[in-house]
């Protein structure tokens, strides 16, 4: 039990009430590793990062690590980098992956260092959920309906007889045009006007939108 373990660790040193309370608390953290409270903490962890509260994010990371769980926060961090930061700071995904790899190689307690770095980065980064909205819109659009064939000019033309079937013959190679762009249809006819990605107002996405608006305005 807790008292026996404390007695073995403290030896002849007097055990204080706060020592017992701390030991019981840490034991309860480990016991609840897969309980409802654990998933509440995981939920609060992601929502705190999404809400850009760096201190709350570190608090919940600490509670997860003290429970002995390293894999759950790692999975959440990888998701958050794409779901909640996303196109506002695309480099976050590779930086977080590097931190995660370091944490897995180091193990606890040193793993807390790269994980804290990843949490601080994500919590303080600009946010965008344009990526998840875009892919979910695309998936919803194709669910339960025929969207049509790939346009002929985009079809594979690397086999004998392809040209006779008009496959790939009208394709325009974008790199042969100014700004590496040429206007041509890429979506199937049935959904040729579909729009899935809507850039959000952060600095990075705004700069991309400005660039492409300028390139495409005279096409």
What does each model-found stretch correspond to?
Residues 30-34, 46-50, 103-105:
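Short amphipathic alpha-helical boundary/capping segments
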């Amino acid at each position: 039990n807790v008292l026996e373990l404390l007695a073995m660790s403290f030896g002849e040193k007097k055990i204080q009430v706060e020592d017992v309370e701390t030991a019981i608390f840490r034991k309860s953290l480990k016991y609840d590793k897969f309980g409802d409270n654990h998933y509440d903490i995981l939920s609060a962890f992601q929502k705190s990062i999404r809400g850009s509260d760096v201190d709350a994010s570190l608090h919940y990371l600490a509670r997860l690590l003290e429970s002995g769980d390293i894999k759950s926060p790692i999975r959440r961090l990888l998701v958050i980098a794409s779901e909640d930061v996303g196109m506002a700071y695309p480099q976050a995904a590779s930086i977080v992956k590097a931190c995660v790899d370091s944490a897995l190689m180091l193990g606890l307690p040193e793993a807390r260092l790269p994980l804290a770095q990843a949490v601080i980065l994500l919590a303080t980064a600009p946010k965008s959920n344009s990526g998840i909205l875009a892919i979910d819109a695309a998936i919803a659009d194709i669910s339960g309906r025929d969207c049509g064939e790939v346009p002929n000019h985009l079809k594979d033309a690397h086999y004998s007889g392809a040209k006779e079937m008009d496959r790939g013959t009208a394709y325009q190679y974008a790199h042969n045009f100014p700004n590496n762009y040429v206007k041509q249809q890429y979506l199937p006819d049935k959904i040729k006007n579909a729009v899935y990605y809507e850039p959000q107002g952060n600095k990075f996405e705004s700069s991309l939108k400005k660039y492409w608006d300028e390139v495409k305005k005279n096409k």
